[in-house]
Regions:
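Conserved small/polar residues in nucleotide/adenosyl-binding loops
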Residues: 1, 301
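Bacterial Sec-dependent N-terminal signal peptides
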Residues: 2-13
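Short internal beta-strands
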Residues: 61-70, 150
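Glycine-rich, charge-decorated loop segments at or immediately adjacent to ligand/cofactor-binding or catalytic sites
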Residues: 74-78, 148-169
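Glycine-rich oxoanion-binding loops at beta->alpha junctions
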Residues: 83-112
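Glycine/threonine-rich flexible loop motifs
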Residues: 121-133
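Conserved anion/nucleotide-ligand pocket segment
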Residues: 169-242
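Internal helical hairpin/lid segments
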Residues: 232-300
Length: 301
């Protein structure tokens, strides 16, 4: 499970996430019409309140929410199309930007001055939240909208693996990054902007980053909320960048179990003594590979 005390310390001072620097955030947003790119990870840890609720309580004019893969609440299966809806608590519209539409349209941005991005990444090139960030940055550049990133630590805080080569661009590889890029989302947004990776426009994005306080690269960080349905704990987050490649095969990585991305198996006893059976498991995966078949392999728990 995730650690119950996720906060870390640098030089004996408590970490303060970008979203928790509410004095800075509200100063940037007061008097502006705001859109949010957020999900279930957009929590102010110290107060245990969602960013949307915190901003509404501060009197910020939040017009709409844009939801990435897995949706605003983070409950959708991998690849599941997310539908538009409304937040039950605030009544604010939630617009999906995962599925047919990967970025906000000019019409959807028409009544906004600024977009705020606050989503927890796990540091892997093919984790789609950073792809969503790229496309929202493109939309902001195309429509002259301000884009603000509230920064968070990267739990896989190192660089590893080959760089995505030209000609292999996709939604799980938008930018030419190594498999593990080692950047926070704020640093990555800055790099996308400065390297000219926003291909749909010659313009750069009007980018601002609300940095963390009392954090530096190398500080450990344990996520307090699972970032997506099949990354339920710290071990799965560590193993995901490696085991994810098996998803291009018919080998199960444990989707449909309580330990996804911590096991490997195939329905053949020759592959090992460890067994597991993927099933339809709400909250994890309802239609996993090798569903209802006994898989033999190994555990990395």
């Amino acid at each position: 499970l995730f650690r119950s005390t996720p906060r870390v310390y640098s030089q004996n001072a408590p970490l303060k996430l970008g979203a928790e620097r509410m004095d800075v955030v509200t100063r940037l947003l007061k008097g502006k019409r705001v859109g949010l790119v957020v999900n279930q990870t957009s929590i102010l840890e110290k107060r245990q309140i969602h960013l949307l609720d915190a901003l509404v309580a501060e009197g910020i004019d939040v017009k709409k929410v844009f939801a990435p893969e897995h949706g605003f609440r983070g409950t959708g299966d991998a690849g599941e199309e997310i539908k538009d809806s409304r937040d039950l608590k605030t009544g604010i519209p939630i617009i999906s930007i995962y599925g047919k539409n990967k970025k906000p349209s000019a019409e959807q941005l028409g009544d906004l001055d600024v977009i705020v991005f606050d989503i927890q990444d796990v540091g892997a090139r093919f984790y789609t939240y950073i792809s969503t960030m790229h496309y929202v940055m493109e939309a902001c550049a195309e429509n002259n909208k301000e884009f603000i990133v509230l920064d968070r630590p990267n739990p896989n805080d190192f660089v590893d693996g080959p760089i995505r080569q030209k000609g292999f661009e996709s939604f799980v590889g938008v930018d030419p990054l190594p498999i593990l890029h080692g950047l926070t989302v704020g640093e990555l947004a800055w790099m996308i902007n400065k390297e000219g990776w926003l291909k749909s426009t010659p313009d750069t994005c009007r980018l601002k980053i609300v940095k963390m306080e009392n954090w530096k690269h190398g500080d450990p960080y344990w996520l307090p909320v699972k970032p997506s349905p099949n990354l339920p704990n710290d071990q799965s987050i560590r193993l995901y960048p490696s085991l994810c490649f098996f998803e291009a095969t018919n080998v199960s990585v444990g989707r449909g179990t309580y330990y996804p991305f911590q096991v490997l198996g195939f329905p053949d006893p020759k592959y090992g003594d460890f067994t597991f059976t993927p099933t339809s498991l709400p909250g994890f995966d309802t239609n996993p590979l090798q569903k209802d078949k006994v898989c033999y392999g190994r555990s990395e728990e």
